[in-house]
Amino acid sequence: MLIIPAIDIKEGKCVRLTRGDFAQKKIYLDNPADMAIIWRKQNAKMLHVVDLDAALTGEMVNFEKIREIVELLDIPIQVGGGIRSVEAVEKYLSIGVSRVVIGSAAVTNPSLVADLLKKYRPSQIVVGIDAEHGVPKIKGWTESSNMQDYELALEMKKLGVERIIYTDITRDGMLQGVGYETTKRFAEKAGMKITASGGVSTSDDLHKLRSLERFGVDSVIIGKALYECNFPCQELWYAYEQDLGIDGEFSTARKKECCR
């Protein structure tokens, strides 16, 4: 199972939210590119980058920050957040982004997804479904759609979408464990390749998700748990302090025994 570290960008900084609540924003580093370097040093094979400002406004506010990450790293970068036009997709792919994530637009403008899949490979265009109790949320999780999560997935499947990034937002940023049953239910009904997201906080969560590989769950996006050093043998503190020398939430005071 592929583990994909997440980088959320708000007002140019690397942040994490709790259940998508912008009022519960925690800044980890001022420069998201520095965070990307840390995850690459941790042997990340792909990064999931989200422009949170764009998710709210539809404007590519943090485009240059994302460009910097793409230019610095030698691994695929997946980008989401407020991508609602063919032009936005073209702009991201033109700078070397490997995969774009269509979220709200899959609900509000499904013809966009159809148009994109006529022009690009399915591996380049994926759909993100962020669900609360089975109902997709859109526009930065501020509005609900009028269908169930699996119904949206099946509609996207008809258009040629092959992969869904599925986020259980009741778990996102909570560090309270993955929504195993919710993800299992969705994966069984969708019958597609699934990247799981939301709530992963321990290695036990990863083992649970791995048991869903037979239903198409082959990868997982992890955010806050990595930032809080919840996994044994994370060496990001060493890489951070020795090579980057940046002050911030990542400090010696926050070291854990497993990270030494």
Curated annotation (Swiss-Prot):
InterPro entries the UniProt entry points to: Aldolase_TIM (IPR013785), His_biosynth (IPR006062), HisA_bact_arch (IPR006063), Isoase_HisA-like (IPR044524), Isoase_HisA-like_bact (IPR023016), RibuloseP-bd_barrel (IPR011060)
Annotated pathway: Amino-acid biosynthesis; L-histidine biosynthesis; L-histidine from 5-phospho-alpha-D-ribose 1-diphosphate: step 4/9
Gene3D superfamilies in the cross-refs: Aldolase class I
Active site: 8, 130
Alphabetical list of Pfam families matching this protein: His_biosynth (PF00977)
Subcellular location: Cytoplasm
One GO CC term, this protein: cytoplasm
MF-aspect GO terms: 1-(5-phosphoribosyl)-5-[(5-phosphoribosylamino)methylideneamino]imidazole-4-carboxamide isomerase activity
Its EC number(s): 5.3.1.16
Annotated keywords: Amino-acid biosynthesis, Cytoplasm, Histidine biosynthesis, Isomerase
The reaction(s) this protein catalyses: 1-(5-phospho-beta-D-ribosyl)-5-[(5-phospho-beta-D-ribosylamino)methylideneamino]imidazole-4-carboxamide = 5-[(5-phospho-1-deoxy-D-ribulos-1-ylimino)methylamino]-1-(5-phospho-beta-D-ribosyl)imidazole-4-carboxamide
UniProt record, GO biological process: L-histidine biosynthetic process; L-tryptophan biosynthetic process
PANTHER family, A to Z: 1-(5-PHOSPHORIBOSYL)-5-[(5-PHOSPHORIBOSYLAMINO)METHYLIDENEAMINO] IMIDAZOLE-4-CARBOXAMIDE ISOMERASE (PTHR43090:SF2)
Family of the protein in this entry: Belongs to the HisA/HisF family.
HAMAP family in the cross-refs: HisA (MF_01014)
Protein name from the UniProt record: 1-(5-phosphoribosyl)-5-[(5-phosphoribosylamino)methylideneamino] imidazole-4-carboxamide isomerase
Source species: Chlorobaculum parvum (strain DSM 263 / NCIMB 8327) (Chlorobium vibrioforme subsp. thiosulfatophilum)
